[in-house]
Amino acid sequence: MRGSRRLTLVTNIVLGLIVLAVGAVCFFPPGVSTAGKVSDRVYYSGNTDSRYVSLMFNVYGGAEYIPSILDSLDQYGVRATFFIGGCWADDYDETVREIDSRGNELANHGYFHKDQDKLSLNGNKEEISRCGDLVEMLTGKKTVLFAPPSGAYSENTVNAAEDLGYKVIMWSKDTVDWRDHDATLIYNRATKDLAGGDLILMHPTKETAEALPSVLRNFAENGFLQVPVSVNISGVEKA
């Protein structure tokens, strides 16, 4: 009888521990901070109380369209942020220097365009630091903003970026210009329901270069000021 009770007690304890373990996994899955969502530490927009908007160009190709993009920015007297892919910069070092010399902001887009949400903490650090080191070697400028390739990030990604002194940047508007080669569509996506603090994702494509003067004209006519991302997010506090 005593043995039976003892067995029942042990069984109940084991079952209780299993329930607690399953509950812990459900409520606090691996890689998710219990102190708050990882996304709370990432910038999806800038200062929403301002009239600032920011074009952010993610660059792993399209070097032939960048001169036209730079000319349009110069024409309107504004500057944008270019998130540079490291392996691209290795082949187009003069283009990187040209972007910088014309007053635009350089930022970090990783080295090999990996899915950084799948990388370890150290793997993320390697991707980010390798790109940052290259841009600094080419221009003497240290990058402080990081946009994850394909918008894919995890807690490891954000921790790695912050450990290296970066702020992680996403976007509030996506023109999807890498896929949809239509200047009118790109223009509409960049300007529809525009709001202060918008971070507008673009890439150097032929159609983006064609649409850009009209986009910048729309900003100006509607009282918005195109500024680099660092200016737009200045003063915006994150967790």
Give short role names for the model-derived ranges:
Residues 1-56, 71-81, 195-239:
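Terminal accessory/targeting
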Residues 31-117, 123, 127-134, 142-143, ...:
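Active-site beta->alpha N-cap acidic-glycine motif
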Residues 68, 114-239:
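Catalytic domains of cell-wall/extracellular-matrix polysaccharide-remodeling enzymes
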